[in-house]
Amino acid sequence: MRTRVIVNGANGKMGILACETLENHEQFEVVAKLSRQDNLGQSILDTKAQIVVDLTRADCVYENSLTIINHGARPVIGTSGLVETQIDELTKLCKIKQIGGIIAPNFSLGAILMMMLAAKASEYFSEVEIIEGHHQQKLDAPSGTALKTAEMMAAARKKPKNKLPLKELTPGARGGSHHDINIHSLRLPGLLARQEVLFGNIGETLSITHNSIDRRCFMPGIVLACQKVLNLTNLVYGLEHLL
């Protein structure tokens, strides 16, 4: 018997590809393709969906996640925009409900490896900044990938970065700071998703870069998340925990 999956945000570019990928996979059945005007909770009840893949927008992803969990389905969240307090609340709710879930800042294997390598490098380099770039239809900044990368590096680093007495002549020139790591966000035509983690040391720099050039690079990660979430009883933040 195939696993019943709803794709929420099915009319977007990622959603269309996700539907195509899951429909062509022997393990899954896409039982509903939802957009903004559809009733997510009622659709879960009507279809008896086991998994909801959310590929919507930052301004509704938290409410969608609550709806999915409270209606007994397992969330696979590929939408950025969740803040740490919201992730904490969703983690608690999944624990109470004994429902597995996955929040994936990035579904690309290459991007996940980039984050893991950046975390490893942070053990040796304390001076680092992140430059992320996306297409202009991405309305939130910084990206979930950049935030997750900063969190992983902050957890791995062994000494604090230097505190420089800099004065910004233009406010925001040094980017935003997350876990004491500066992040610079680009939104340009011609980009899909790109991130560079740039480390500096005396007499040298180290750059770790990932560039997504086709949304199909995210599809194996969506399949993996849908396969793994069925065996979870807790919320997992980051696909690196499932590799």
Curated annotation (Swiss-Prot):
PANTHER family the UniProt entry points to: 4-HYDROXY-TETRAHYDRODIPICOLINATE REDUCTASE 1, CHLOROPLASTIC-RELATED, DIHYDRODIPICOLINATE REDUCTASE
Stored SUPFAM superfamilies: Glyceraldehyde-3-phosphate dehydrogenase-like, C-terminal domain, NAD(P)-binding Rossmann-fold domains
Protein name: 4-hydroxy-tetrahydrodipicolinate reductase
Pathway assigned to this chain's UniProt record: Amino-acid biosynthesis; L-lysine biosynthesis via DAP pathway; (S)-tetrahydrodipicolinate from L-aspartate: step 4/4
Catalytic activity: (S)-2,3,4,5-tetrahydrodipicolinate + NAD(+) + H2O = (2S,4S)-4-hydroxy-2,3,4,5-tetrahydrodipicolinate + NADH + H(+); (S)-2,3,4,5-tetrahydrodipicolinate + NADP(+) + H2O = (2S,4S)-4-hydroxy-2,3,4,5-tetrahydrodipicolinate + NADPH + H(+)
Class in the EC hierarchy, top level: oxidoreductase
GO molecular function: 4-hydroxy-tetrahydrodipicolinate reductase; NAD binding; NADP binding; oxidoreductase activity, acting on CH or CH2 groups, NAD or NADP as acceptor
Originating organism: Legionella pneumophila (strain Lens)
Lineage summary: Bacteria, Pseudomonadati, Pseudomonadota, Gammaproteobacteria, Legionellales
Cellular compartment(s): Cytoplasm
Location (main, coarse): cytoplasm
Pfam families recorded: DapB_C, DapB_N
Active site per UniProt: 134 (proton donor/acceptor), 138 (proton donor)
